[in-house]
């Protein structure tokens, strides 16, 4: 606007040369008042994260298995804004990036470790234990004396459970740029001892005495909380099981 006004005044006072000088002064004034303009990059409008359904069972893991896990806590998405460009009449560009913190339950019994992790089918954490994107990871192995996670303590205070007896992981500030700024589908390679003795352990847990050879063919097993009879029937397809009922 100042460009037009000062250009017109300059033309009236000093002719064409005055108009050029006035227009130049006007452009400088416009930049001071209006600025160089700004471009906004894509930005999310919904920052809440959905967690797993209440009451969803957490399986017991044996041996080496790959599981999706269940999200038991999540923060809202954290938004970061960065501005680049500008100067010499060029507009500034604002870009947005997002991260999330979340806890994912893996097993209802203790585990030894978590090896590889995939996000949307791509390797997120390799055998060396390094995340392929920004953020950090903590593994809680599910022992009876495990302390609460420090991030959950900071967020939930006195309401924070330790999830003793439940193995879970906590991602802190997991960067989401590589996943379309959304929480990706996760899967975890979990090592939980040996699966060869799973039949005996499940039988004893449900009040049975099981006498059988180890299930040598079994590298891993996911016990989803079904009945002992159903579970042992599945395992009996791999090796003969001798099972006796032990009354209470």
Regions found by a protein language model. Name each.
Residues 1-19, 205-206:
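Short hydrophobic membrane-inserting alpha-helices and related fusion/pore-forming segments
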Residues 16, 20-247:
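Polar, S/T/G-rich
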């Amino acid at each position: 606007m100042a460009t037009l006004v000062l250009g017109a005044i300059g033309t009236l006072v000093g002719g064409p040369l005055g108009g050029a000088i006035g227009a130049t002064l006007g452009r400088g004034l416009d930049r001071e008042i209006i600025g160089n303009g700004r471009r906004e990059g894509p930005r999310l409008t919904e920052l809440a994260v959905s967690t797993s359904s209440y009451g969803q069972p957490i399986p017991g893991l044996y041996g080496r298995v790959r599981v999706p896990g269940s999200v038991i806590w999540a923060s809202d998405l954290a938004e970061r804004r960065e501005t680049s460009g500008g100067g010499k009449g060029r507009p500034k560009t604002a870009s947005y990036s997002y991260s999330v913190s979340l806890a994912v339950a893996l097993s209802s019994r203790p585990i030894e470790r978590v090896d590889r992790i995939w996000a949307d089918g791509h390797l997120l954490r390799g055998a060396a234990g390094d995340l392929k994107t920004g953020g950090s990871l903590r593994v809680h192995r599910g022992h009876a004396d495990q302390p609460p996670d420090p991030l959950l303590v900071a967020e939930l205070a006195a309401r924070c459970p330790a999830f003793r007896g439940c193995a879970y992981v906590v991602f802190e500030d997991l960067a989401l740029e590589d996943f379309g700024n959304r929480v990706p589908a996760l899967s975890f390679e979990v090592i939980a001892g040996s699966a060869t003795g799973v039949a005996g352990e499940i039988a004893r847990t449900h009040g049975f005495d099981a006498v059988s050879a180890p299930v040598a063919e079994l590298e891993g097993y996911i016990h989803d909380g079904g009945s002992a009879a159903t579970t042992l029937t599945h395992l009996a397809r791999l090796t003969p099981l001798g099972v006796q009922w032990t009354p209470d």
